[in-house]
């Protein structure tokens, strides 16, 4: 079993999945993974399917040189965005793998949240392209490693109510007006 860069906070309520040397662009995958980080699992799967159908875009924040603008990026507070279909496919496969791992461990799949997702660069693959005058240039690819940790969301426990209600704070101005009103009557 490979090492993960981070251990889950509660290992009994978490599950992991990872992929190594995946033939998908690192930069696109990093931006897509950053977008779905901390999302509930159901929302992340829906988002990635929407990206494939170009209904929602992935905002490009770091690797955004030459990236065009789109109106769908406004909901993320930026102007540049794309629809990286292959990255969405790979992340969907990984999330489905992690979900089946969670199901195997007996976790509630409806309460899963993406606690940690990380994309690292893998060794570049070298090919060649033939140029004019007998020259050869490199034709490199940028694969990546992806790891994801899903955790069950903790249930929020409501505080017990106290018997006496909290006193409403009144500003000095309003207090002075109220006293003035009482003196007039």
From Swiss-Prot:
Superkingdom of this protein's organism: Eukaryota
Gene Ontology cellular component terms for the protein in this record: cytosolic large ribosomal subunit
Keywords from the UniProt entry: Ribonucleoprotein, Ribosomal protein
Pfam families in the cross-refs: Ribosomal_L22
Region (Disordered): 158-185
Keyword Acyltransferase: no
Any GO BP: cytoplasmic translation
Biased composition (Basic residues): 167-176
Gene Ontology molecular function: structural constituent of ribosome
Stretches that traverse the bilayer: none
InterPro entries membership: Ribosomal_uL22, Ribosomal_uL22_CS, Ribosomal_uL22_euk/arc, Ribosomal_uL22_sf
Family, as annotated: Belongs to the universal ribosomal protein uL22 family.
This protein's name: Large ribosomal subunit protein uL22
Organism (species): Diaphorina citri
């Amino acid at each position: 079993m490979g090492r993960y860069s981070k251990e889950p906070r509660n290992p009994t309520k978490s599950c992991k999945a990872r992929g190594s040397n995946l033939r998908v662009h690192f930069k696109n995958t990093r931006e897509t993974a950053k977008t779905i980080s901390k999302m509930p699992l159901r929302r992340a799967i829906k988002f990635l399917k929407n990206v494939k159908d170009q209904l929602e875009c992935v905002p490009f924040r770091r690797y955004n040189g030459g990236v065009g603008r789109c109106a769908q990026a406004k909901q993320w507070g930026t102007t540049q965005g794309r629809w990286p279909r292959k990255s969405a496919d790979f992340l969907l496969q990984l999330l489905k793998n992690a979900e089946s791992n969670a199901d195997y461990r007996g976790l509630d799949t409806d309460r899963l949240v993406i606690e940690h997702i990380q994309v690292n660069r893998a060794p570049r693959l070298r090919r060649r392209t033939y140029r004019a005058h007998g020259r050869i240039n490199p034709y490199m690819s940028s694969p990546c490693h992806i790891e994801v940790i899903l955790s069950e969301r903790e249930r929020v426990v409501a505080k017990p109510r106290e018997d006496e209600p909290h006193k409403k704070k009144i500003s000095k101005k309003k207090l002075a007006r109220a006293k003035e009103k009482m003196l007039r009557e």
